[in-house]
Design a protein with these regions (language model features):
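N-terminal glycine-rich FAD/FM-binding segment characteristic of electron-transfer flavoproteins
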Residues: 1-224
Length: 224
């Protein structure tokens, strides 16, 4: 048709060369962002720890909690009893309350250093604000407001299920070529673990340059 068209109305554009897919080897483990307010872990985080333990059995990996704040040591045992095998802990007075920039900066540094396979976060105001920034910075996809999570048995990738088209269908989304696989999960759709006081875990304390904790915005007041 192209050769026969005397008006040259038809063309075939050459496909642009595609970028090479990133190397996803070496990414391992499930991370849960442990959302805290006033030094107390929010219940959605415990729900995600419980679900993560189910997923971890299918992946043969650890579940780690990411805890950013200040004076949080009194919460550590409870976090381990409720499902965390490891806790990555970053504490400083400037991190007492959530702020987008420093929390994002810390998360990016931790991902670069430890390379998690999956990152889960509550679909809360804080969770949505933080994890979307992280995903954009590392150029991976993010499935929002999940109501179901599972592991595909053959390729061992995260199945992220969420309502779509106004809730008329349930869509299952996968991210086979990029790591970490990231999702936010709705509150009260997952079951927390029963606390097991015999569980043991590892605390990894991380310290970064103070410049990483600086925010261009100033928190004036928290209104409940």
């Amino acid at each position: 048709c192209i050769d026969a068209c005397k008006f040259k109305a038809l063309i075939i554009e050459k496909l642009r060369p595609t970028c090479a897919l990133p190397d996803i080897k070496g990414y391992k483990g499930i991370w849960v962002f442990l959302e805290q307010k006033n030094g107390k872990i929010q219940s959605v985080s415990y729900e995600l720890l419980g679900k993560s333990q189910e997923l971890a059995k299918k992946l043969n990996c650890d579940v780690s909690g990411i805890l950013i704040g200040n004076n949080m040591d009194d919460q550590l045992n409870d976090i381990i009893h409720r499902g965390a095998d490891n806790i990555y802990l970053v504490q400083a007075p400037e991190l007492q309350n959530f702020q987008d920039e420093p929390y994002t900066n810390i998360f990016l540094k931790l991902i670069e250093k430890y390379k998690p396979e999956i990152i889960l976060c509550g679909a809360t105001a804080i969770g949505r604000s933080l994890i979307s920034r992280v995903a954009v910075n590392i150029k991976v996809g993010l499935t929002a407001d999940c109501t179901g999570l599972d592991i595909e048995p053959n390729k061992k990738i995260l199945l992220q299920t969420r309502p779509a088209f106004g809730g008329n269908i349930m869509a299952t989304i996968i991210s086979p070529n990029y790591r970490p696989q990231m999702a936010t999960v709705r509150h009260k759709v997952m079951q927390p673990m029963e606390p097991d006081t015999k569980r043991k875990g590892k605390i990894i304390r991380e310290n970064f340059d103070a410049s990483l904790y600086v925010s261009r915005t100033k928190l004036l007041e928290i209104v409940e």
